[in-house]
């Protein structure tokens, strides 16, 4: 699991779900409490790649509370057989800068694909 370091005194942390090249699909973004099976209030967040709405989500404040929490992104994509592969990314931002990214490449030739991306948030940027 990738660890992403953030500043407790910086701006609000956000998580974005990206797919390149554009594909049909949806996702669920979960923010897990540190060392428990409980989700943070307000999580999960849902979205899909079929509209122009943003797929960026602001995490709750204060930032210090995010230390040790886990972000899990569950993605389902439909890939027509003639379409080339795609890359799905979970991008973590703070103060307008990318502070971390976890990504997976999807193999060619699959019609439907599910994947999970995990990131642990740690203070100390």
Please tell me what each predicted stretch does.
Residues 1-43, 49-70, 76-125:
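Beta-strand-rich recognition domains
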